[in-house]
Amino acid sequence: MDGLYKVEYGVNDAFGRSIMCLHDGKMLGGNSAFAHLGSYVERDGEIIAEVITERHNEDPHYKPLMGADVARIGARGRLTGNQIRLQGGADTMPGAGFWANLTRLDDGALPPRGTIGQGGIAN
């Protein structure tokens, strides 16, 4: 289950996209405006996740999907193939249904491993 995922998520009629790295029970990710930090456990095939989403970009054109600059999301779901499908809710929007589909990104698209030379990495 550990790996890098693209994430499509929504609440009510709003939706967004992010990336998320899952590793050893931790969830780290985000997008252009919000960081997503959390944890997960797997019990009897069910994934239980808790995520805090927090604004890192003060641009007012990026609206918070959860109605606030900081929100706590709780969700449960299952891994099916290369996707994790979650459903839950956020503390900032009681009663609203939150969903997320995480699709694992193919490691085959990564560049080959190697050493970084004296000049480091440059653009």
Q: Language-model segments: which ranges?
A:
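Contiguous, well-ordered beta-strand patches that form the walls/edges
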Residues: 32-83
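Short, flexible N-terminal segments of the mature chain
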Residues: 20-31
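Exposed beta-strand and adjacent loop surfaces of beta-rich binding modules
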Residues: 2-4, 37, 46, 99
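Short, solvent-exposed aromatic-acidic interface loops
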Residues: 12, 30-35, 52-57, 89-95, ...
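Edge beta-strand at a domain terminus
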Residues: 42-44, 83-85, 90-123
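A structural detector for beta-sheet-dominated domains
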Residues: 8-10, 23, 50-52, 78-80, ...
